[in-house]
């Protein structure tokens, strides 16, 4: 309860947005000596022309370009004291770097060279890019919860959003595949530049110069429309056990963010089980559980993922989780609704404060024109609205269940619904 606790007015952080030479730019200044710069590309796995090509294209970033070799870039990066990160999502490829504030011109130029003048050489694909992509996949597949959520996406959407984020060995990506995809993605229509702790006017001027001769291109689109499906996936592995219960959503709504926050999962304090319905479902077990909502604009996926060593305990928690969703559809109290709102607001603010996640969020908004997670846009829903959303999900005609690990001992969909 927060009755009687004073609250202070908090100033919202704002990014100034503009277009520079046809490229969308968002930036905000700050007092830190470290700047953060990201290039967000509309080219995630949902747009992949062949399986895994988005992941491979991401790993080609900062390989040999016409102006300089990969080795030269590495040496220069170390001289400047900067750091480089890249990752791929279902919707975007993100190239991100951190550096001392005065070195902004160098890194804007480096990003522009990646998009305009990467050589895409066969030996790089064979000796550098493909092995790194394989290690990336192996690292993620060591987590059964990741594998379960990936499998749930594949069942729910099949193609497009159902495409694997990571390149898979069974479907090799050729150099021509990468070149063709790069020609589509590396275009002004698919690029957003996001700067944290940079002077907005400086970034806009530098982008306007460095990206001026980047091809105009056209918006990358998904092949075919997004369709929703129900079903099951059973993945036998020895890396651990996990179960994802997923419910595809045809019309994404902000209320599902609040519902995921309400159902919860991980405790807010390390020595506490937590008071959320899903946290209570794990009492007496050695399992972890979390509700997540994945909003992709044209569709969504509400997921509850359970992980643990014991298949019997996972099965027990899964039944309780489904019941918790049904119970939420029956009744939500005012206090529970207030708790869901506070957690949603905090999660959105936390994402905005983290330079990595904020770059993805802001870049996504620049490219799509739709705000999905800004803290000031988080709505406060009534208990009735939360109950209605939960009731609609629990009555879904297309539930998805993805089991990973000792699948012979994990529940099937018809045992849960």
Swiss-Prot record:
PROSITE patterns xref list: INSULINASE
Biological role: Component of the ubiquinol-cytochrome c oxidoreductase, a multisubunit transmembrane complex that is part of the mitochondrial electron transport chain which drives oxidative phosphorylation.
Subcellular location: Mitochondrion inner membrane
Description of how the protein assembles with itself and partners: Component of the ubiquinol-cytochrome c oxidoreductase (cytochrome b-c1 complex, complex III, CIII), a multisubunit enzyme composed of 3 respiratory subunits cytochrome b, cytochrome c1 and Rieske protein, 2 core protein subunits, and additional low-molecular weight protein subunits. The complex exists as an obligatory dimer and forms supercomplexes (SCs) in the inner mitochondrial membrane with cytochrome c oxidase (complex IV, CIV).
Transit peptide: 1-22
Keywords linked to the UniProt accession: Electron transport, Membrane, Mitochondrion, Mitochondrion inner membrane, Respiratory chain, Transit peptide, Transport
GO biological process, one term: mitochondrial electron transport, ubiquinol to cytochrome c
SUPFAM superfamilies: LuxS/MPP-like metallohydrolase
Tree of life domain: Eukaryota
Any Gene Ontology CC annotation: mitochondrion
GO function terms (MF aspect): metal ion binding; metalloendopeptidase activity; ubiquinol-cytochrome-c reductase activity
Provenance organism: Yarrowia lipolytica (strain CLIB 122 / E 150) (Yeast)
Keyword Iron-sulfur attached: no
Disulphide linkage map: none
Protein name: Cytochrome b-c1 complex subunit 2, mitochondrial
Membrane topology (UniProt): Peripheral membrane protein
Family: Belongs to the peptidase M16 family. UQCRC2/QCR2 subfamily.
